[in-house]
Regions:
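N-terminal auxiliary segments of SAM/dcSAM-dependent transferases
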Residues: 1-26
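A short glycine-rich, Lys/Arg-flanked "PGG" loop and its adjoining helix->strand segment in the class I
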Residues: 139-152
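A short SAM/SAH-binding and catalytic strip from SAM-dependent methyltransferases
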Residues: 120-140
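Conserved SAM/SAH-binding beta-strand->alpha-helix loop
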Residues: 90-91
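SAM-dependent methyltransferase
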Residues: 2, 151-213
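Conserved alpha-helix/loop element of class I SAM-dependent methyltransferases that forms part
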Residues: 42-62
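Conserved SAM/SAH-binding loop
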Residues: 70
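Conserved SAM-binding strand-loop segment of SAM-dependent methyltransferases
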Residues: 101-112
Length: 241
C-alpha cells in the first residue's frame, strides 16, 4: 500500500495520538457519507452490542483476527487468554494495534494467509469484516483457503450488515444498480477518504443471513448461529464441517 492510500490507517493513528479524525466513505454510485468515525474502532467490550458479545463468546483456542484495525477485538481476546494474531492491510493501523498492546500483528491481506501462520481454532471477522470476502466467488475461494489453516472443529465469528433492512431510497436503488451489473445486492464498491488520503477502490460484501447460508453451501462451512441486533447489524457463528 502506498503512503497516500492509507486513509484508514492515518485516521486511526491521528485519533489514537490526538483524539481527532473523521472517515468519509465514497461509493461507486456517487454517494458520499460520513461513517460513525474512528472512535468506533477503539470501543471497549462494555460498549459493544449484545449481538457481538454473544458471538465473541464462541471464540476458542488460537485466533486469527482478520482486519484487526486498531486492535479492539484482539486486545479483548488476549485478555481472555487467547493466543491472537492480528492481520491488516493498513501499516498505520497495525502500528496502532501494536502500540495499544496487541502482541502479534502482521501487515498482510487476508488473501495471503497460509499454513505458514500455523493452525487456528477461530477466525474472527468482526467490525462488519465479513465484508472482506468481497464477492460470492472470492468468498468461496477464501473459505476453502481457511480450511487449510484451521483445526477440524474450527469456527469463524463474523459481523456484517443486512443490506435489505433499510427503506432509504439511495440504498435500494444501489441494490438494483448492482443486480443490473450481475453483482450481489449488497456487494458495495467503495473507498475511504481522510484529509488528502484515499484508499484504492475495493468491494465490501453485505449479506442477509439467508444469503450468508447460501454462500456457504458446498464450502465445508455452515452457519450455526445468528445473533441479530435491533438494527441491520448482526453477527454469526460459522462452523467447519
Amino acid at each position: 500500500m502506498k503512503k497516500g492510500q492509507d486513509a484508514y490507517g492515518r485516521e486511526v493513528y491521528d485519533y489514537f495520538k490526538h483524539g481527532t479524525g473523521c472517515e468519509i466513505v465514497e461509493r461507486d454510485d456517487g454517494l458520499v457519507s460520513m461513517s460513525t468515525g474512528p472512535d468506533a474502532y477503539f470501543t471497549e467490550y462494555r460498549d459493544w452490542g449484545a449481538h457481538l458479545k454473544k458471538a465473541i463468546a464462541f471464540v476458542r483456542g488460537r485466533v486469527l483476527d482478520v482486519g484487526c484495525g486498531a486492535g479492539r477485538h484482539s486486545l479483548y481476546l488476549q485478555k481472555k487468554g487467547h493466543d491472537v494474531l492480528g492481520i491488516d492491510t493498513s501499516p498505520l493501523a497495525a502500528k496502532v494495534a501494536r502500540l495499544r498492546g496487541v502482541k502479534r500483528v502482521r501487515v498482510m491481506p487476508v488473501t495471503k494467509v497460509s499454513s505458514r501462520l500455523g493452525t487456528f481454532d477461530t477466525i474472527v471477522m468482526l467490525g462488519n469484516n465479513f465484508g472482506l470476502f468481497e464477492s460470492r466467488k472470492r468468498a468461496r475461494w477464501l473459505l476453502n483457503r481457511f480450511r487449510s489453516i484451521t483445526s477440524e472443529d474450527a469456527r469463524i465469528i463474523v459481523e456484517t450488515v443486512d443490506p435489505y433492512r433499510t427503506d432509504e431510497r439511495h440504498h435500494l436503488n444501489y441494490h438494483k444498480f448492482n443486480r443490473r451489473r450481475g453483482r450481489m445486492s449488497g456487494q458495495t464498491r467503495l473507498r475511504v477518504r481522510y484529509l488528502t488520503y484515499a484508499t484504492p477502490w475495493f468491494d465490501y460484501l453485505l449479506v442477509s443471513p439467508d444469503e450468508m447460508k447460501q454462500l456457504l453451501e458446498g464450502t465445508g462451512w455452515r452457519v450455526a448461529k445468528v445473533f441479530r441486533s435491533k438494527g441491520p447489524a448482526y453477527s454469526a457463528v460459522i462452523e467447519r464441517l
